[in-house]
Amino acid sequence: MNNRRNVSLQCLQTALKLMPTHFAFRLALSIFMAVLPLLGMSMSRSIYSYVEASSNSPQVLSALVFPLSMYAIYLILTKAYTVYYQRVAVQFGAILTFEKKIKLLLHKKTGEIDMRFYEDPSFYNSLWEAKVASTNIYRVAECLIEFISISVSILVLSSYAASIKPLFFVFIFLTAMPSLSEQVCEGILRSKRQKELAIVAKEERTRWEHITNIESAKERIVFGNYPLLKAKWLHTTNQFQEIEFALDRKLLKLSACFALIRLIAIAGIYVSASWFYYIGNIDYADFITTISVALFLQAQYGELFEVIGYYSEFTTLVKPYFKFMEIKSDFPSEIACDAGTIQLKNVEFSYPTSSENVLQNIDLLIHPGDKIAIVGVNGAGKSTLAKILSGLLHPTAGVASGLQSRYTRVMLQDFQCYALTKDENIALSEIHPKDPSLIRSLSELLDIADIPSGEILGREFGHRDISGGQWQKIAMARLFYHQGSVLILDEPTSAIDPLYEKRLNEIILQQATPDTTLIVISHRLSISKLLNYVYVMDNGRIIEEGRHSDLLQSPNSVYRQLWEAQTSWYK
């Protein structure tokens, strides 16, 4: 119970933080609409009293004007509230606005989470569940407002019914029990279904993207795997529908059972009211009003328990959002270090999906302005070390210092190719490029000036497609455009032809000023001889280090073996 109360408070705090005016106005309006039926009932009672009195003796017609006018106002206000606020303002305005704002909070949170979490596949399930659960915050807030307004309405109208005949209050209350039982059972079933559907829904969406997205169109054509992908999607879709249909069948049986009980309870109201009217304890107006109040309250009780059921469901469904928002990064302790110096000491790293360390006992000391290369065969741990040095990942053991992401610019091996123009790809994070002249000079320097600046890149159907080498140059231009005191390049020439590789290496050194720390990670050694110092990695360890010329002097060094193997290609 306390847990559900805490979730409710979190939902209210979030809702009021994002849309305070909306929810305050919504509460005030709901309470007003909760009291409004009292006006309708009292006016209808006056009208029926007038009709009954008219059957016995002539009545002044003007006495009917006021109750009819007020009853008309009641009907107009009720209809206007239903049509405008519930169907227009809420469904097509407030909910959409709230969803946009809550997604921005999620996006902000994903930018604050340690990158190590992104290496765990289960993290993406948590992120997906949080995204789906986030809209339930609005629903929880709405349920609480509805609960307050319906409770006020029931209290007011029950008091009104009791003023006619106290016994009616007891009968009306008894009609609420079937609705209560139905909503509790339905809420339990819906919560169970939502939990079962969460993973299936994600899988179904992924399967659908496999057979519809443009990126995989080529492989669908080349390998002819469309029938397989379609069969996988249909299987998941059928599984999704079976879970939904199973719940619908159970709900139908429950509804039929409780509808019968509810019918018996309503019949009891009619019989008791008819008996009191027959023996003369109430007049015709009281009889009709009692029946109207009973039917209205019976519907109100149904709505109340429906809201309670939805509240129970939504407070359960919303938990993944708050669980995701409470994720905290465990940052390693730092050691004292000179300004601008990067130091790793006994650093180890393992991905959440593996028990083995990808990096082991890494010791590095990089001073401001150092130009170093980190080389090794594929799978040596170079890219993981690059992410450690850039601050994207944090060591699982050991200490690190000087990893200031604000001043570090990184060109990752798996850099992003955005469906934007060339200029937008380079000046990424700037809505309007602040330095168009720098973009032009970098484009000329990297031989990508011939790519039109105004065309969307990266889509084969309808937009301009460019080669992998051109994309790599754009990623490098992005790095140089944003500048920084530390430049990290992970496999910067992997898609570049050998004829241009030498020129690109010279450009990299040219862009790194004497005060700039340059770290190049590569399994191609053409650039390592141009840098001051070389670290050689294998199986997650630094096995050799030194200057290029010194490492070549050692006949058994791994670096020399790599160098000779690569240079032999061109002999």
Residue ranges and their predicted role:
Residues M1-P37, S57-P67, V90, D120-L155, ...:
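Membrane-integrated ABC transporters
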Residues K17, E129-V140, K192-I199, E209-T212, ...:
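An intracellular "coupling" helix at the cytosolic face of ABC transporter transmembrane type-1 domains
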Residues F23-Y84, F147, S151, L157-R190, ...:
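Transmembrane helix-loop-helix hairpins at lipid-water interfaces of multipass membrane proteins
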Residues V88-L104, K108, F171-E215, A231, ...:
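Cytoplasmic coupling helices
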Residues L127, Y418, L445-I474, W569-Y570:
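ABC-fold ATPase nucleotide-binding domain signature/coupling loops
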Residues N225, I269, I288-I327:
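Cytosolic ends of transmembrane helices, especially the final helix of ABC transmembrane type-1 domains
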Residues S390:
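Helix-to-loop junction immediately C-terminal to a conserved catalytic motif
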Residues P514, R524, K529-K571:
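C-terminal portion of ABC ATPase nucleotide-binding domains
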